[in-house]
Regions:
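Compositional signal for N-terminal targeting/processing segments
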Residues: 1-311
Length: 311
């Protein structure tokens, strides 16, 4: 039976999820949505957060610099040019992590930690594989380093196992939503056999890898490019932000394509093809995520911009 999703206080909803889960994963909101960032800051500043959560695992930092980040969030002085290496020397050749919202999270945790005793201070765990670019001088060097790390999703899973679960801690994971899928997607393409081969081995995202080891994860999608009100009309009346559990609701029974209408690009013998999620064969939303964080319609959202000094 389908019933309408109902909004709840998002901070309380996330913290309640930690009562039954050691890992809660939240989509970062399109790599730069300022309202998604504002929610994360409100969550971290909430006095209950540090009582329940020990670590924050982020996509936006190279784990090679973990020791330096530990010192920074603990309040030690770290030179600006040294600190920036954590997000500027990742495996990703783009400027997304230079958007102020990503550095801002590190500085916010540092600030929150000033009011916490040492044994309750929040730790930032950098999730990107530890590529040392000073040692990369050829494609072969990069392949070797990449193979040693094991991939952008398997590496943070190792970190969570070693630094969080083995130490009986709890972690908030902040990553792009496509890293948090439970099940693989099907894609519409001309060469369906090739696409199925490329995209449908065993699931290998962060959440699916953890759950394959019987570690249950509570996961939250943040819709910033589509309006959930197209799936359930009364969403327009919800306060922003709001959290909503989606199983058994119109929001949960909708196709994943309803939330992710974007193409990806695949390469084959005929060139590069633009492909989209197959809404019929792919798992529906409630098979991928437990809840959504509603921030308002896409037209009301704003985006973190690069500093003019970096443009």
């Amino acid at each position: 039976m389908t019933t309408a999703a109902s909004p709840i206080d998002p901070i309380t909803g996330v913290l309640e999820a930690f009562a039954s889960h050691d890992v809660v994963a939240i989509c970062d909101g399109g790599h730069g949505c300022e309202q998604a960032y504002a929610f994360r800051i409100s969550l971290i500043r909430d006095a209950r957060f540090a009582h329940m959560v020990n670590d924050i695992v982020v996509e936006s930092g190279n784990s090679l610099y973990q020791e330096m980040m530990d010192r920074f969030v603990a309040g030690e002085d770290v030179p600006e040019d040294t600190l920036r290496q954590a997000w500027q020397n990742t495996t990703q050749p783009h400027d997304v992590w230079d958007r102020p919202v990503f550095e801002g999270l590190f500085r916010e945790v540092r600030e929150v930690n000033t009011s916490l005793p040492k044994d309750r201070q929040i730790r930032i765990l950098l999730g990107d594989p530890p590529i040392d670019w000073s040692k990369i001088s050829s494609a072969e060097d990069l392949v070797e380093a990449w193979n040693a790390a094991g991939g952008r999703d398997s590496w943070p899973v190792r970190i969570i196992q070693r630094e969080v679960l083995a130490k009986r801690r709890r972690a908030l994971v902040i990553y792009g939503g496509m890293h948090l899928l439970r099940k693989n997607l099907y894609w519409q393409a001309k060469n369906q056999e090739l696409v199925n081969h490329q995209f449908n081995p065993l699931p290998d995202g962060i959440v699916s890898l953890l759950q394959s080891q019987r570690i249950e994860v509570f996961s939250v999608w943040v819709p910033v490019f589509v309006d959930p009100a197209t799936l359930q009309a009364d969403v327009t009346s919800w306060p922003t932000p709001s959290l909503a559990h989606i199983r058994g609701t119109p929001l949960g029974e909708a196709s994943f394509r309803s939330y992710y209408p974007h193409p990806i690009f695949t390469r084959h013998d005929d060139g590069i093809e633009e492909i989209y999620v197959d809404p019929i064969r792919s798992p529906v939303m409630q098979e991928q995520f437990d809840a959504i964080l509603y921030l308002g319609p896409p037209t009301a959202l704003t985006w973190s911009q690069l500093s003019p000094t970096l443009v």
